[in-house]
Amino acid sequence: MLHRALVLLLGCASLLAQQQTQTFKITPLKPVPQLRAEALKALPPAESGPFRQPDLTELVKLDPTIKLDIHYASDNNFMGTPFYTQARAFLQRPAAEALVRANARLHKQGYGLLIFDGYRPWYVTKMFWEGTPVADHLYVADPSKGSKHNRGCAVDLTLYDLRTGQPLDMPSSYDEMSERAHSDYAGGTALQNANRALLRSALEAEGFEVNPNEWWHFDYKDWRLYPIINVPFEELTPSTAKEP
């Protein structure tokens, strides 16, 4: 309850929450249709394995109280264009079940999880890398290595208040490419830093590790056990995406 007391005490800082709703933007190095065409023709890196059979599970079917705000299914993202045709979020089953446990843990404190992204087809990672200026490559995954999102073992998320349904204020907006996005950034307000710490503690308790460059990005501990996947949501088959 200490965290909620801090939220109430610092509620007067609500103007700072506007920073959370402002979408960070870049100017892609190439036109997005060109990036997409090139990425769809490219092949993911070869891997030797062995790997577990993919078992991508849709998060909201496992726990309907998990909320979605899939930025890459709209133009509300850092490139200003949709990358997905469906606003859905998947993780490998063990990671999905761990996330559900974290959500239940947070509910006891009056909060829930709001998902920005989960499994991400490899070609989208390729588009991000090729479209982002080299100076900002710290914030996008190298497609020659693949992203943990591509393995269904990374999730981008934040917290929302169960009473209001509104996301909590954090030190930066989602996908912001600046030091404010770093998980150890100390320049936020006391409230922002407390919110970030609450999210991190809940996820770490269930086997996730925060990305040092992105407070919202968490990798599941078993990510090495799964292969890179390059299948759009609408083409996922029962062998990769299963009902709970």
PLM features: residue spans?
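Bacterial N-terminal signal peptides
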Residues: R4-S14
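Extracytoplasmic cell-surface/polysaccharide-interacting catalytic and binding patches
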Residues: Q18-G118, G131-N213, D222-P244
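Segments that shape or occlude catalytic/ligand-binding pockets
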Residues: P121
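Short, well-ordered surface patches within globular domains
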Residues: V124
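Structured alpha/beta reader/binder surfaces that contact nucleic acids or chromatin modification marks
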Residues: F128
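Conserved metal-phosphate-binding beta-hairpin within the catalytic cores
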Residues: F218
